[in-house]
Amino acid sequence: MKTVFAILFLTFIALTCARNYEDLKEKIKNEVEREIFEDLEEESDELENNFKKFNDAKPWTRWIRWKTIVPFIPAVIAAAGKK
């Protein structure tokens, strides 16, 4: 009789640990997903802020940027046209 109770007790402990393990695994998975989403939201906010800064530039600043890019356009077109 003692052996039966011992086996039942050990089985109960094993099932409890298995449930706890699955719960723990699920909690860890949810925590990691939540952290990933938070990081992505922060990066998205940073990108939006940088985009706003770029678009908020004064027109003459945009012209200066364009002026520095224009000389490279023929070289890019020539390189793209070669086979």
UniProtKB/Swiss-Prot annotation:
Kindly state the tissue distribution recorded for this protein: Expressed in entodermal epithelium along the body column.
As recorded, the propeptide runs across: 19-57
Query: Lineage of the native species?
Result: Eukaryota, Metazoa, Cnidaria, Hydrozoa, Hydroidolina
User: Which stretch is the leader sequence?
Assistant: 1-18
- Name the protein family: Belongs to the arminin family.
* UniProt GO cellular component terms: extracellular region
Q: Supply the name of the protein.
A: Arminin 3a
Alanine amide modifications at: A80
